[in-house]
Amino acid sequence: MGVISEFKAFAVKGNVVDMAVGIIIGAAFGKIVSSFVGDVVMPPIGLLIGGVDFGDLAITLKAAQGDVPAVVLAYGKFIQSVIDFVIVAFAIFMGVKAINRLKREEAVAPSLPPTPTKEEVLLGEIRDLLKAQNDKPLP
């Protein structure tokens, strides 16, 4: 089997396609959460603590000199990233929790015993006949 045909077989498998879709949706969800945090959550929080824009919070370690930019610790952006992470982690946690609950409900549902196959029925009849023959008294 050639490399290209092996790759096709790998790429077409359901798990790989599902994983790729999950990664794409996850990246899009991350952008939505970043926008939500930066544009919806942080402005009111900044307003509550005195009109601070968290994106601008930084400590200058070395001032800019000519063409050399300043060296800064942009801890405001870090705070926003931490909040992004917490929201994404919480959303994933809630999703996994819901999936686990559905799996538990499926496991709890009683399953009917499987119906015996024709061979199993025939073997049972043979067993019963042999048992009946062995239980007869000897002449």
From Swiss-Prot:
It is found in: Cell inner membrane. The chain crosses the membrane at residues 9-29, 79-99. It is a multi-pass membrane protein. The keyword Magnesium does not apply. SUPFAM superfamilies: Gated mechanosensitive channel. Its main location: membrane. InterPro entries: Mechanosensitive_channel_CS (IPR019823), MS_channel (IPR001185), MSC/AndL (IPR037673), MscL_channel (IPR036019). One of its GO terms (molecular function) is mechanosensitive monoatomic ion channel activity. PANTHER family: LARGE-CONDUCTANCE MECHANOSENSITIVE CHANNEL (PTHR30266:SF2), MECHANOSENSITIVE CHANNEL MSCL (PTHR30266). This is Large-conductance mechanosensitive channel. It comes from Pseudomonas fluorescens (strain SBW25). The gene is mscL.
